[in-house]
Amino acid sequence: MAIAENYEDVLKGKYPAKAHAKKVAEWIIAKGGDKNGTIYLEAQKQKLNEDNDGEAPFRQRRYFFYLSGCELPDSYLTYEIATEKLTLFIPPVEPDEVIWSGLPMSPEEAKEKYDIDQCLTTKDVNAHLTSTSESAQSTIYAIPEQVSDHITFISYKEKEFKQLKPAIEYCRVIKSDYEIALIRKANIISTAAHEAVMKAASTAKNECELEAVFLKACVERNAKNQAYHSIVAAGEHAATLHYVHNAAPISDQNLLLLDAGCEVDCYASDITRTFPLKGKFTTESLAIYKIVLDMQHQCINALKEGVVWDSVHELAHKVAIKGLLELGILKGDAEEIFTKRISVAFFPHGLGHYLGMDTHDTGGNPNYADKDVMFRYLRTRGSLPERSVITVEPGVYFCRFIIEPYLKDEEKKKYIDESVLEKYWSVGGVRIEDNVLVTKNGFENLTPTPKEIDDITKLILST
């Protein structure tokens, strides 16, 4: 059985907060940290919208959630490294609040729900910090911009504010079964939503109609939060990588690019599909789709523990160059085109990024100042560890803003046939994105959303 394939059974257990805390503590100790120290984290505060009394949308701090599994706002936690004791502090009952919101979770209920050793109320935080047995001779680890003014670390010998954040970011890369199960569930729900959009596409009159279809399918499956703002781009709008207007009329455009994914218990899915709105590709759009699908198949098949992501990104460019040469859009020697980075005009972004609690998850070590334009926007660099989850999202785009400077450059334009290119502007862009778990000897694709040509066209035409 694949890892966490039985995700519903896995999710009957508790989020592994203590295992995460121990892993973070081990990282700190391995870097020379205090084995008798205490880790301290705060949840996000519930805030009001500016200039009114309505609550702003709440998003839990991921650093706090990773060591607690708790989505309650205004909470705190401590983890005592030597004793491996994890304590959660949640807001106490406030009678005025009960009138409006009902009774909050009690410490007893929290102890039952979360993977913690004890639960106190937020009134006890400072007293607990001062009473920790080893505090006078030990170190408190915290994230400086995430410590409330009323919190005091006065009883600790050392205050360390640099190690905790990178420790958590590093540990988040390698996923537990529970985390993989959450990502699988998010992918299952998002797949149902993508399929609903495909079925509704042929009669849609506006991009926003299809965005609404996606959101409805997620919410009715109790996935009320999106991992990011959906991209619903018809025709040439798909040439804009992060097009988010989602409000243009749909008339004679051939393709729709849908980049959308829901979130389940703070874990993201990130899926892109491009398909013909009426169920039939044009000659040009089909040719580009086949290139991108080939790019993705080859890159996914290259994945396993230890593979260098930069090299897989290069592979995507080489497959794109081969395909664009066959179509006549590019001309000349494939190796020269690769070396001179001409393919970046058509594939300007990175092949993918780590996925987890954030859509662009931590630990990727990107270099946005890289002088090599092929790698500047590659959000993950270096080798991929086992149990990391990476998005594989190759694309080919016809963006005038990006391509036209190449056509004005005497050295670069000789590799592009403008007369052939002219036929492809209306394609806009094609991107196909899956969420892939890296295993010791290969991979597991967590995204079951249809993408093969026959599968998507049959689905669209079935309505």
Swiss-Prot record:
Binding site for Mn(2+) 2: 259, 270, 433
Binding residues for Mn(2+) 1: 270, 393, 433
InterPro entries named in the record: Aminopep_P_N, Creatin/AminoP/Spt16_N, Creatinase/aminopeptidase-like, Pept_M24, X-Pro_dipept-like
GO molecular function, a single term: manganese ion binding
Enzyme class: hydrolase
Reactions catalysed: Release of any N-terminal amino acid, including proline, that is linked to proline, even from a dipeptide or tripeptide
Superkingdom to which the source organism belongs: Eukaryota
Keywords in alphabetical order: Aminopeptidase, Hydrolase, Manganese, Metal-binding, Metalloprotease, Protease
One of the GO BP terms on file: proteolysis
Keyword rRNA-binding: no
Cofactor: Mn(2+)
Keyword Lipid metabolism: no
EC annotation from Swiss-Prot or TrEMBL: 3.4.11.9
Manner of cofactor binding, per the entry note: Binds 2 manganese ions per subunit.
Function of the protein: Catalyzes the removal of a penultimate prolyl residue from the N-termini of peptides.
Membership in a protein family: Belongs to the peptidase M24B family.
The protein's name in its UniProt record: Probable Xaa-Pro aminopeptidase pepP
Organism: Pyrenophora tritici-repentis (strain Pt-1C-BFP) (Wheat tan spot fungus)
Gene: pepP
